[in-house]
Amino acid sequence: MAYYGVAPKHMVKSAFRNLIQWMKDTRVEVKHSNEAVIDGIPRDVFALVLKIVINAIYGKFGFEQGPLYDRLATLQVTVNGQLMLLMLCEELELNNIQVISANTDGLMVKVYEDKKDDFDRIINWWQTTTGMSMDADVLHCLIARDVNNYLAQFRIKNKKTGALELEDEFKGDFNPLMYANDLQKGYSMPIVAEAVYQYFINNVPIMTTLQNSNNILDFCMTQNVGRQFHVEETKVVNGKLQTKVCQRYVRFYVTNNGYTVEKVHNVTGERSRLAAGMQVCVINSLDDADIVSRNINYKYYYNKCYDIINPIKLGITPKGKGKTQIRKKAGMYNRLFDD
């Protein structure tokens, strides 16, 4: 919103606006530069840092303890920005250009060749009318469950050769390295996201990807429970139940011959099983055991993959809503008696 001079009331509006505009212009220049390194910084890193800083400034408008706090500035950016994007969505749809999804700062649009001129005209009109600028990337394919969980492949021109290359972008459950990008997400069986990727992009059967992995960490997940709980393993040894208290942060995988792991409330004794009550094996300390000896429950991971795939291919929700209609349309429901 630098174009409209949005700034915290207690700051010099012109100086603040010029700073934001400089960061925006620099980011666009860096992003489209042919240089791999700019001022000693890799091009992609430079562009990403500027994007994060610009977005962070908006976030600081709403932070009461911060030096940029201004509730009115927050509303000016939010409300006006959304209205401008809605105006663009409306114009595109009125011209039979499908808007696939929209969020706070951008749109995903499906443009056929015969609509390319209309699309360019509408974008130019919108930029002129609002004073905003629009940057676009071309998608090769999009596989999405919702706006927060998707796999996208972008067509990127190689800066040196000029050839088009495909660049992957993952978000949410589709990202095998989600835990590395956001430590709060925890570590959760990266093999699932990898198998889904191979299934959609390279047509590799889910079970093939699962069984080809030799790294037990691909199948592991972690659970960090609050201090009001402790973690217990329960297993059968020589026909008797044995219970052992584990550390609160536990790493485990699902197996065919393991044991149950539960978090137990320290006061009430209330219990809840990890991994939906499946048999698991705790592996807080990594060893060199062969993957075959782990006796991994591949069916569990297979089903987890299809929890992602089915909502996309069958048009149902992640919780399975819509299966009834699918069965009816497929003729899988038969009346007990004829009419």
State each model region's role.
Residues 1-339:
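Conserved acidic
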